[in-house]
Amino acid sequence: MLKISIYLIIVNISALIYAENDQYVLLVSMDGFRADYLETTDTPNFDKLANNGVRSEGLKPVFISKTFPNHYSIATGMYVENHGLIANSFFATDLDKYYTMRDRETVENGNFYGGEPIWVTAERQGVKTASYFWVGTEAAIAGVHPSIWKRYDQKVPFDDRIDSVMAWFSLPMSHRPRLVMLYFHEPDWTGHKYGPSSAKTVDQIQRMDGIMGTIMDKAGKLSIADKLNMLIVSDHGMTEVHSNQIIDLSVYTDLSRVKTTGAGPTVFLSAESTKTLTTVYNDLQQLPNAQVYWKRDIPDRWHYRNHERIPEV
C-alpha cells in the first residue's frame, strides 16, 4: 500500500511539473491584411513584434483566395480540394445543400467541413482550445468543438474580444486553453468598401497596429506571459478593382440556363444538361481578361479540382 501511495504522489508531482511547463499559443488573424500594408504607414507595434520574433515576406493563399477557404486551410494544413470548404458560398452536391457564411444553420453544420482542424486534433489529445470567431469553430467537426467558442457577431468590439481571450488565459489550469484562435474582420472590411489604397484603409491599418499593441500589452501581464507564443496571420491580400474591369457574364451568354454561385474573381457554373453547359462554356470563351475552365482542366498548381463540390465550369 505504501509503494502505491508513493507512486501516486510521484505521478501527480510529475504531472504538475509538466503542466507548469506547458506552452501556450495565441493565433491571431487580421482578415485581408496585405503583406505590404506594413510598409504603407507607421506600424510600431507590428515592427516591435517582428523585431523580437520572426517575420515572413508574406502568405501565398490557397485558391480560391477567399476568407473561409483560407482560414480553414490555415487550421487544417490542407488545400481546398482536400477539405471541401471550396468558397465563402457554394452548393455542396454531396449534401444537397447550400453553404453560405451568413447562414447560421450551415455554418454550424459540421458535415460541410472536411479534414481535421488543429483544435479537433488538440481536443482529442486532451489539450483545451478556444476560439473567438475562427472559421469552422462554430460547428461540431467530427463531433468536436473547441472547449470555448463564440457564435460570430461582427458587432462585438475588438477590445471586448481581446479581454475575453486574456480572461481565458487566466482561467485555472484545469480549464485554461493552451491554443486560442482570435479573428478580426479588419482591415478586410474597410479595404473592400473603400479600396486597399484609400486613406480610410491606411487609417484602419494604424488602428489594427493599435489593436496589436493592446494584445501585446495585456498578454505581457499574464501569469503565463513567458510561455505564450503569438502568431499573427492573414488569409489573403487585396487589389484595386475599377468599374471598367467588371465583367457582366449575361452579356455573353444566357445565364438563366445555368446555376451560378460565387462572386468576385471566381464564379462557378453548373447545369443539369452537359449540352447546355457546353454551350455556355463556348459562349464564355469570348470573355476579355478572364479564363474559363472545365473542372478537369483546372491547373494542378491550384489544387482545386479533386473534390465533388467543385462545379464543372
Identify the residue ranges that each predicted region occupies.
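Loop/turn elements at helix/coil->beta-strand transitions in domains of secreted/extracellular proteins
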Residues: 21-26, 52-56, 82, 124-130, ...
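Structural recognition of the beta-strand scaffold that forms the well-ordered cores
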Residues: 25-29, 36, 57-60, 73-75, ...
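Metal-dependent active-site segment of extracytoplasmic phospho-/sulfohydrolases and closely related
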Residues: 27, 45, 207-249
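Short, structured active-site-proximal loop/turn typified by the sulfatase FGly-forming signature C/S-X-P-X-R
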Residues: 36-83
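His/Asp/Glu-rich, glycine-adjacent segments
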Residues: 77-195, 288-289
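A long, amphipathic alpha-helix that forms part
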Residues: 158-170, 187-228
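Active-site neighborhoods of enzymes that stabilize oxyanions during catalysis
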Residues: 261-313
